A protein has these predicted regions:
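FNR-like FAD-binding dehydrogenase module
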Residues: 1-281
């Protein structure tokens, strides 16, 4: 009950399946905080495990917990001598938060349907123990065709919308699943062009590893290029010995990009901002 007061979304007053509770309401893979680790240490009487947990909560925390993204659950598996009450465990766990995806389709093309582009996350855990699997991406990948998925819509920021005037040129940079919103942009402009409206020039810089592995929407994108909806420039980072990224393609096409910018083009970037955006800029 005390846990539920702080976690108001937890089911209270009704029986609940333990698996459902853990899988659908709690963030089990969240990195343990110093306070979390110290709490585990307080519930550990083992003369070997207790000092080890105390060290992880203090000097060793950054290198051994934070940087390796070790969760409370993983620490409990590593230190079975910890006698943490389940109610306290619930108090330590944050609630499952929404996962946000860009809609990768246009209502002008499919008014009653929307698409999302999801990369399934399943990689070796940074801790070196097991596999880190994305909660939502794997849930979606494992859902059978025809399954009902509960979702909500959020309005996008004003800065990430197609110009109201379709004749304004646009430049799009999106490696990997960063292609998602731009697929919607291109569908929108294709529909506008089909309706007889003039559309501005567009350039799409897309990046993936290999043309035969993860060139998503290849036929569709090449079709847009053929139809004059957008110039397509694709960077393959694993096709040859030398790695090519979207920023390299931007550099190659700098004259065309600069010409569009001088003509009032709007530029959009979607992807891993921490690594790609500085190079793009």
């Amino acid at each position: 009950q005390s846990s539920a007061q702080e976690h108001s979304q937890l089911p209270v007053g009704t029986p609940v399946n333990l698996r459902k509770l853990l899988a659908e309401t709690l963030e089990l893979q969240t990195v343990a905080s110093r306070k979390d680790v110290a709490t585990l240490a307080r519930y550990t009487d083992c003369p070997h495990s207790a000092p080890a947990l105390k060290a992880l909560a203090e000097d060793d925390y950054k290198a051994q917990v934070q940087q390796k993204r070790v969760s409370v659950l993983e620490l409990l598996e590593r230190f079975p001598a910890c006698d943490l009450p389940f109610g306290v465990f619930l108090e330590l766990m944050p609630l499952l938060t929404p996962r946000y995806y860009s809609i990768s389709s246009s209502p002008l093309q499919s008014p009653e349907r929307c698409a999302i582009t999801v990369g399934v996350v399943s990689d070796p855990a940074l801790s070196g123990n097991g596999t880190f699997e994305g909660v939502c991406s794997n849930f979606l990948a494992q859902s059978p065709e025809g399954a009902t998925i509960h979702a909500s819509l959020r309005d996008t920021s004003d800065g990430f919308r197609l110009p109201e005037d379709p004749s304004v040129p646009i430049i799009m940079v999106g490696p990997g699943t960063g292609i998602a919103p731009f697929r919607g942009f291109l569908q929108e402009r294709a529909a506008l062009k089909d309706s007889g409206k003039a559309i501005g020039e567009a350039i799409l810089f897309f990046g993936c590893r290999h043309p035969d592995q993860d060139f998503v929407y290849r036929d569709e994108l090449e079709g847009y290029a053929k139809d004059g909806i957008a110039d397509l420039h694709v960077a393959f980072s694993r096709q040859e010995q030398s790695k090519v990224y979207v920023q390299d393609k931007l550099r190659e096409e700098r004259d065309a990009v600069w010409a569009l910018l001088e003509n009032g083009a709007k530029i959009f970037i979607c992807g891993d901002g921490s690594r790609m955006e500085p190079d793009v800029r």
